[in-house]
Amino acid sequence: MRQDKLTGSLRRGGRCLKRQGGGGVGTILSNVLKKRSCISRTAPRLLCTLEPGVDTKLKFTLEPSLGQNGFQQWYDALKAVARLSTGIPKEWRRKVWLTLADHYLHSIAIDWDKTMRFTFNERSNPDDDSMGIQIVKDLHRTGCSSYCGQEAEQDRVVLKRVLLAYARWNKNVGYCQGFNILAALILEVMEGNEGDALKIMIYLIDKVLPESYFVNNLRALSVDMAVFRDLLRLKLPELSQHLDTLQRTANKESGGGYEPPLTNVFTMQWFLTLFATCLPNHTVLKIWDSVFFEGSEIILRVSLAIWAKLGEQIECCETADEFYGTMGRLTQEMLEQDLLQSHELMQTVYSMAPFPFPQLAELREKYTYNITPFPATIKPTSVSGRHSKARDSDDENGPDDEDAVASAVGCLGPLSGLLAPELQKYQKQIKEATEEQTLRSNNIAELSPGAINSCRSEYHAAFNSMMMERMTTDINALKRQYSRIKKKQQQQLHQVYIRADKGPVTSILPSQANSSPVINHLLLGKKMKITNRAAKNAVIHVPGHPGGKISPVPYEDIKTKLNSPWRTHIRVHKKNMPRTKSHLGCGDTVGLIEEQSEGCKASSLGAAEEFPSGRTVTAHSEGSSGDGDGGGSTPRTIEGQSPEPVFGDADVDVAAVQVKLEALELNQRDAAAETEPKVHFPCQRHASELADAPGENQTAIKLLPGSTSKTPIFSPFPSVKPLRKSATARNLGLYGPTERTPNVHFPQMSRGFNKSGIGNSSTKKR
């Protein structure tokens, strides 16, 4: 339709020229040129025929003509088409993007066939493993629906190959989080062609976007975020002031925290993904068309247009939390409900300022070379201009020293408040010493006068005051917290002392004679493992001992010796000797072991825990009174038995005790008493258990009947399989008398077992 209107206007101009008469060839050419100049620059070059003075070979095509001039004409024409409300048609987009990418690759003299073989080879490079892991993590988070779900597995494989190919192409950038979203949209436009998608990614990241946009800790991205805040303050001053107010309020309410600029959270995501995660797909493609032709400043323009559209609802927010909640809701509405119309958005983008954006290059240069996270204090404004230039250059050249001082102050914790003035004084001396050398060096202000504006000192003063206030508040908060913790610990310590001093001391137990070890409260309720270190430091007070104390002996060694299988077998064998002589009782070793009482076992364990040194001490019943003297023997009376002397002499002859025990005879009354219910009494270990410990003086106690501890089964003969007891044989009494069976004796079996036991023991002794 535009072509018909334009052709009709030209025909009417030709008829007017005919009515005016022949004015010569010059008049005709001048009129034609005037008509051509009236053609809007926002419309593409069209096919014009049947007019005198117009080149009939001038045609508009999707492919540029040969030569640099032909490409420039094609570029200008497509740039004008991109500015239209309809934008570049969907059918043209793939061809247009590929033409731009091919021209860039040709300009840098790239052999594309060789590049394809290198980037898409099947062999794994050393750097592919780490990048491949991160790529796979991000594949499932790709926002495009065509790459989600199990049915899109093949599409994700293609996406991974494209991302890995670009990482191989540009190793300085590698893979950055967010590339998966860019590559997914490019693959959608390229209809899944891997090579074409790689071309577009190379052109977009290496040519269109600023250098180091995705490398060097996203430095160029940080620069654009700072530039955007200045542009927001310039174009939307009311909204910018409102956001600054919310930020200051949040800083005051946080109690020493620091609230970043409120726009950073959203603009960073917009810049990294080029609005692919916050706007509909058709709007994003129009924005990308403009980015390919106009450059990266379109990103800043679109961000300003979005904030201008959302400004009315944002100005109603009264707190930073309310702002974040509102922006979360608006972002979802922009993506799903077309809150922003694409033609209105692009019209705002192109009409807000002429191209290129005024002061954009200066602002980028300023923040690129003057990003100081912790700048030095600004001196008074009465200093001369030359001195001010030197200060600016010093701020730019020395951020590392300032960061080092800031980190050193922050790492000192509560003491940083005392050392901060000294560090600042030291920093000031260093700067004054290097001031003359800095005056002679080159200055960024001399290289680019527009990079440093007139309000630089005010800006730095405000920024320094904010950072110093934040740092001081943090230190004061740490001091207060440290003092509260220290005071609380002191109060708890006083409470422990008060509770320990309550009530008179009535009695002192032997376990309280020594100071108890410190136990972590987290280990309460768990069984404490006894080590040799604790046993070595322990001293036991024994009333019956002559000295009142027993020297510490390693508990684990004594316990191991007493519970060894061979010593258990010897003890059982010694018990069987009197029974063998009298031909009474059961000769089965297993039956004797089963008859041992559980109460004796419990009391034995209690005695071992109470006396960890492993010594056998004099046992006192609950009804006994007083402590015996160290030299004599203390009688012990048990209900139902006659008093038995307990030898308390430390120099007792162990061999004599063994002879007496071996000569001890057990009668029929003792065997019958085993089947009756027995009363368990606290018992001590037999003196023979300690008889084999060489070089030690021990206190022996006479063994009570039925009070031996339960010991494991042991056979001196080597056996592949251990002896197993049959339940039927036990019920028949083959293993000795039990509660279910009468007291039946087998003399022949007992003789055989005893003879074999005696023979084995004698052989073992040899």
Swiss-Prot record:
One of its GO terms (biological process) is negative regulation of cilium assembly. The keyword Membrane applies. Residues 422-491 form a coiled coil. It holds the Pfam family DUF4682. GO terms for molecular function: GTPase activator activity; small GTPase binding. Its main location: membrane. It is a peripheral membrane protein. Residues 87-295 form the Rab-GAP TBC domain. It comes from the Eukaryota. Residues 393-404 have a biased composition (Acidic residues). This is TBC1 domain family member 30. Residues 751-766 have a biased composition (Polar residues). It is found in: Cell membrane. May act as a GTPase-activating protein for Rab family protein(s). It comes from Mus musculus (Mouse). Keywords: Cell membrane, Coiled coil, Membrane, Phosphoprotein. InterPro entries: Rab-GAP-TBC_dom, Rab-GAP_TBC_sf, Tbc1d30_C. The modification Phosphoserine is found at residue 642. GO terms for cellular component: ciliary basal body; cytosol; nuclear body; plasma membrane. Residues 380-406, 603-647, 731-766 are annotated as: Disordered.
